[in-house]
């Protein structure tokens, strides 16, 4: 009754309307030093164990790999650095270590990081982490991967979570990122960016990383 035809012959009759993008990115580019972790003689450190296809994680307590007074990634044992960068204000980078991503080189970063949607990144070294995070900051949100002499980034200008671009083009760009992360960087996860996006979600056990540091859901 008094209806309006909005689609016909598989084509929309609705007029497109442009809207401004909503976003908030108030962090400046980082430097490599921001991602370094001091070694204080720890015998063991808490390590997040990411599980393929799962939102939960396990806690492992492992012997850290130290080099020149710093705790560094141990790619031979798949213990990599994970960081969370506060995107809403200037703050120190939160750092920890994670097992299960399988990266042999480079880093990946994302501003899709439930629920606060800060920037979360995993990488084999501080230089790669810095590059990946700064790509996301430059785009004011998105997904990035660096390594093997290449840099890939998918900008997500709407709140750092979504794109206002063509859906098919965005899907192709995401597929390229996903394949690059697995084939070039060596990730063994089915969906590296999906797993990454839940590593800062504290309400799902057991060990996660927020912009304030590690959070153990079993003992808080």
Task: Label every model-predicted segment.
Residues 1-220:
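Active-site microenvironment of metallo-dependent hydrolases
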């Amino acid at each position: 009754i008094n209806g309006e035809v909005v689609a016909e012959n598989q084509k929309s009759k609705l007029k497109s309307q442009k809207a401004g993008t909503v976003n908030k990115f108030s962090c400046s580019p980082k430097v490599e030093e921001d991602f370094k972790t001091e070694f204080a003689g720890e015998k063991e450190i808490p390590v997040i164990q990411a599980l393929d296809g799962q939102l939960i994680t396990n806690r492992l307590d492992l012997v850290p790999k130290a080099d020149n007074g710093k705790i560094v990634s141990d790619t031979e044992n798949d213990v990599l650095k994970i960081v969370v960068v506060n995107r809403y204000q200037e703050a120190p980078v939160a750092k920890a270590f994670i097992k299960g991503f399988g990266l042999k080189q480079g880093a990946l970063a994302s501003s899709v990081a439930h629920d606060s949607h800060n920037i979360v990144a995993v990488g084999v070294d501080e230089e790669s982490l810095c590059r990946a995070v700064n790509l996301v900051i430059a785009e004011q949100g998105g997904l990035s991967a660096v390594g093997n002499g290449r840099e890939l980034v998918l900008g997500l200008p709407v709140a750092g979570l979504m794109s206002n671009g063509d859906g098919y083009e965005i899907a192709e760009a995401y597929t390229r990122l996903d394949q690059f992360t697995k084939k070039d960087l060596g990730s063994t996860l089915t969906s590296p960016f999906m797993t990454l996006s839940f590593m800062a979600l504290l309400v799902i056990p057991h060990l996660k990383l927020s912009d304030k540091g590690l959070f153990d859901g079993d003992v808080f």
